[in-house]
A protein has these predicted regions:
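N-terminal core-binding DNA-recognition domain of tyrosine recombinases/integrases
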Residues: 42-56, 66-142
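N-terminal DNA-binding module of tyrosine recombinases/phage integrases
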Residues: 1-53
């Protein structure tokens, strides 16, 4: 028999979260923070990929795509005076294959913007970063 005095309030967002729920919340908050550091149009891509990917994948892709935009601002004369919020899908379309080749070379060893730490990527790291970029381009240029 169900007690009619059972409090249904414990189904609200005030109850403690289990590990998986808390991890999802933390990753969602982290993704939102990373998205603030990317061009505004990029949010559309991440909304579209949400149903087909984990929060962790989206965070990693966001970091990888941010590295790409920073690479363009630091190494491509066309984007030297850009701020990250100025980029548009048209800028991506204007890039040449050599720009992507130079990016791939750059990814082997580069300094992280936040702390200047030297980052190196082996084959797996390069493959993931290029996968993020391919997926990103695929969304905008189907």
């Amino acid at each position: 028999m169900i007690d009619s005095s059972t409090n249904l309030a414990n189904t609200s967002s005030n109850k403690p979260h289990n590990y998986h729920e808390q991890s999802q919340i933390d990753q969602t908050v982290r993704l939102r923070e990373v998205l603030k550091t990317l061009p505004p149009f990029v949010k559309d891509y991440f909304r579209a990929m949400e149903p087909k990917s984990s929060a962790r994948t989206r965070i990693n892709y966001a970091y990888d795509i941010r590295v790409f935009f920073h690479f363009l601002m630091e190494n491509n004369p066309v984007y030297k005076n850009y701020t990250i919020d100025r980029f548009t899908p048209q800028d991506l379309e204007n890039l040449e294959p050599v720009d992507i080749e130079e990016y791939l070379e750059y990814l082997k060893v580069y300094k992280r913007d936040e702390d200047g730490e030297l980052i190196t990527n082996g084959e797996k790291g390069l493959a993931r970063k290029m996968s993020a970029l391919r997926s990103f381009y695929g969304y905008y240029f189907k």
